[in-house]
Amino acid sequence: MTITFLILLFTVVKGDQICIGYHANNSTEKVDTILERNVTVTHAKDILEKTHNGKLCRLSGIPPLELGDCSIAGWLLGNPECDRLLSVPEWSYIVEKENPANGLCYPGNFNDYEELKHLLTRVTHFEKIKILPRDQWTQHTTTGGSRACAVSGNPSFFRNMVWLTKKGSNYPVAKGSYNNTSGEQMLVIWGIHHPNDDTEQRTLYQNVGTYVSVGTSTLNKRSIPEIATRPKVNGQGGRMEFSWTLLETWDVINFESTGNLIAPEYGFKISKRGSSGIMKTEKTLENCETKCQTPLGAINTTLPFHNIHPLTIGECPKYVKSDRLVLATGLRNVPQIESRGLFGAIAGFIEGGWQGMIDGWYGYHHSNDQGSGYAADKESTQKAIDGITNKVNSVIEKMNTQFEAVGKEFNNLERRLENLNKKMEDGFLDVWTYNAELLVLMENERTLDFHDSNVKNLYDKVRMQLRDNAKEIGNGCFEFYHKCDDECMNSVRNGTYDYPKYEEESKLNRNEIKGVKLSNMGVYQILAIYATVAGSLSLAIMIAGISFWMCSNGSLQCRICI
């Protein structure tokens, strides 16, 4: 008997298809989200400035006041080595070296010096005004000087101060006053000399048991010289102690002394207030402009954050400790696997992007008898671009509050306060850094979810148009039950697909496909049964043949019992 096996081959012919997908490119930009790290995206925006120009620049067109080798005290008192600072124009900020050489040439101290520096962070210009002319002290010698402040080997003194000493053998009570009619607050500085011993006291002032008294409407200060033997500094065993006050408009300051007074010749009218600061750096001014200055260099940026230096002056981004703050603006960048082809590459429409679609974020790929191609969905892409652009700009605008962070000065008696201040500032900085990083993580999560939602919406838009005229094939694609030429494809893309036009054709093709599926099931069942029976029969014949052969050669004894 001859058995003929009939092998049926079914060739599956794919119908016209349209897929929804999104753009992909060669970008290696990575962002972090709340749930993921190092997510590759097609587009991103860095909002953390990391660079500076390494220069000191004019701030908004106004140069800084460079003190050079002089300190704040040397400038205001008039150290002879600081003569170039006797008259200074408006400044944007003050540049002081870390350890300037020319401060108090005559050794001593400056009371409330750190508070004075803090005052200077709110001032951008002083007008120097003569308040107690040197020639008014007719009963005293006003040419006092010291070799500690020598110029060209000759004794000298602070240019803005007058050291009153005895005239002949007399030092009558010295009195002077100034009425502030300038219309602005006036910075007034004075001093008291503490001699090394009684001999020096009598040599300079004749009197012993002297005092220096200063009074305003809010100040009443009386100081007594402290005569003591001290180590010599700059060749001097004596010390000078300087104090200052802000004299209000129409207020009067009165000086009275029986000896040891360092009287002011000039006061400093606060002629212009503004945001300033003291920049501690060894750099010098260069020919450049900026809106934000740090000790390391100028920052020119519109970004809301920077990590260059915590101390800044001008319109500056907020300093954070972060190394990276990147906002996602594009989509997840997962290019399709080219070797697998378009329709085999995408397991889901948010699992693989199309590098071939370059004119939009979201769009379509179609395949029909006329060919295949990509087409971006311009409307959804533009809405997404506008939405994300507005969001990024809003984030930058909200966080781009301009800050100035100038260093605070503390004297040796305030170290505990300084340490507490540093801890507080570090705490605030940690909070700002955390807020910035959390903001970026949350916005990136929302942006990527936004893109996924837009692709899903586009998919649903197509699905609702096609209804049962096409089937979903589970990869972001639809296979039509009817022929769909380029005009038909375009109608699907622009939302004008005519469902009734293709309904009858789709219905017929859909029924035929169902019939083929049923007949296929019958054939498969018959083949399965036949294969089982044939296999069993073959096994039985094989066993019988082996048994017969073994019986014939004596290897197997066969007994037939009746």
UniProtKB/Swiss-Prot annotation:
GO biological process: clathrin-dependent endocytosis of virus by host cell; fusion of virus membrane with host endosome membrane; fusion of virus membrane with host plasma membrane; viral budding from plasma membrane; virion attachment to host cell
Extracellular side: 16-525
Pfam families: Hemagglutinin (PF00509)
Signal peptide positions on this chain: 1-15
Site (Cleavage): R340, G341
Lipidation (S-palmitoyl cysteine): C551, C558, C561
PTM remark: Palmitoylated.
Molecular function terms from GO: host cell surface receptor binding
Topology within the bilayer: Single-pass type I membrane protein
Subcellular location: Virion membrane; Host apical cell membrane
Keywords for the protein's UniProt record, in alphabetical order: Clathrin- and caveolin-independent endocytosis of virus by host, Clathrin-mediated endocytosis of virus by host, Disulfide bond, Fusion of virus membrane with host endosomal membrane, Fusion of virus membrane with host membrane, Glycoprotein, Hemagglutinin, Host cell membrane, Host membrane, Host-virus interaction, Lipoprotein, Membrane, Palmitate, Signal, Transmembrane, Transmembrane helix, Viral attachment to host cell, Viral envelope protein, Viral penetration into host cytoplasm, Virion, Virus endocytosis by host, Virus entry into host cell
Ranges of the Cytoplasmic topological domain: 547-562
GO terms under cellular component: host cell plasma membrane; membrane; viral envelope; virion membrane
Disulphide bond pairs: C19-C477, C57-C288, C70-C82, C105-C149, C292-C316, C484-C488
Membrane-crossing segments per the record: 526-546
Family listed: Belongs to the influenza viruses hemagglutinin family.
Quaternary state and interactors: Homotrimer of disulfide-linked HA1-HA2.
Miscellaneous remark of the record: Major glycoprotein, comprises over 80% of the envelope proteins present in virus particle. The extent of infection into host organism is determined by HA. Influenza viruses bud from the apical surface of polarized epithelial cells (e.g. bronchial epithelial cells) into lumen of lungs and are therefore usually pneumotropic. The reason is that HA is cleaved by tryptase clara which is restricted to lungs. However, HAs of H5 and H7 pantropic avian viruses subtypes can be cleaved by furin and subtilisin-type enzymes, allowing the virus to grow in other organs than lungs.
Protein name: Hemagglutinin
Species name: Influenza A virus (strain A/Mallard/New York/6750/1978 H2N2)
Source taxonomy: Viruses, Riboviria, Orthornavirae, Negarnaviricota, Polyploviricotina
Gene name of this polypeptide: HA
